[in-house]
Swiss-Prot record:
Record carries keyword Cell membrane: yes
The protein's name in its UniProt record: Inner membrane-spanning protein YciB
HAMAP family hit by this protein: YciB
Location within or outside the cell: Cell inner membrane
């Protein structure tokens, strides 16, 4: 359930982009009429309308996520606050400057922030962030926790680079597809690989 909740802004970004992409002239007119005050020059063109509207949707969705959690008295994860800050700043820049480059950098920056957090927890604070997040759900040797930590660091670094590669090498619609399907697919594959690694080790420990 949490996975779907976390995925919601990405899904809404995808849907908003595809709807606007299917009727760019109407999307441009709608964006100019209702959100022109947020855009430099006050006018939105058909080519840029899909990504600008999708960006506004994802900003609102992220604010709504945090608002929902706060209203229910639940803790807001640190990375969700970071994501809100990034999507507001970079998304706002995309809308104001008519430049999709800013929002395209957002996933990479978020991945690298998470990877840096994992690295700093190990290198500076001598703690294993993954072990802390797991909350004692698994009992593993320090070496295994260390390997898992570095696996996540490498994965976040790779995902940040992969996002930029797609963003700069392919049209925006391909990047939007990758953002949802590629990002989620790679995350699931990595999680599966990590699960296989853990299951093998846990079996060894049980024996």
């Amino acid at each position: 359930m949490k996975f779907l909740f976390d995925l919601l802004p990405i899904v809404l970004f995808f849907v908003a982009f595809k709807v606007a992409e299917g009727q760019p002239d109407a999307a441009a007119a709608f964006a100019s009429q209702h959100f022109g005050f947020l855009v430099s020059g006050g006018m939105v063109g058909p080519k840029e309308a899909p990504v600008l509207l999708a960006t506004l949707v994802v900003i609102v969705a992220t604010f709504a996520q945090i608002g929902w959690l706060l209203l229910r008295g639940r803790k807001v994860d640190t990375m969700l606050w970071v994501s809100l800050g990034l999507v507001t700043v970079l998304g706002g820049a995309t809308v104001w400057f008519h430049n999709e480059t800013f929002i395209k950098w957002k996933p990479s920056v978020l991945y690298w922030v998470m990877g840096t957090a994992f690295w700093l927890s190990h290198a500076v604070f001598r703690k294993n962030l993954l072990q802390t997040l797991m909350g004692g759900q698994l009992q593993l040797p320090p070496a295994v926790w260390r390997n898992l930590n570095f696996m996540w660091i490498a994965f976040f670094a790779f995902m940040g680079l992969a996002n930029l590669y797609v963003a700069y090498s392919f049209p925006t619609d391909v990047w939007v597809n990758f953002k949802l399907f590629g990002g989620v697919g790679l995350m699931l594959l990595f999680t599966l690989a990590q699960g296989l690694y853990l299951s093998r080790h846990i079996k060894t420990e049980d024996e």
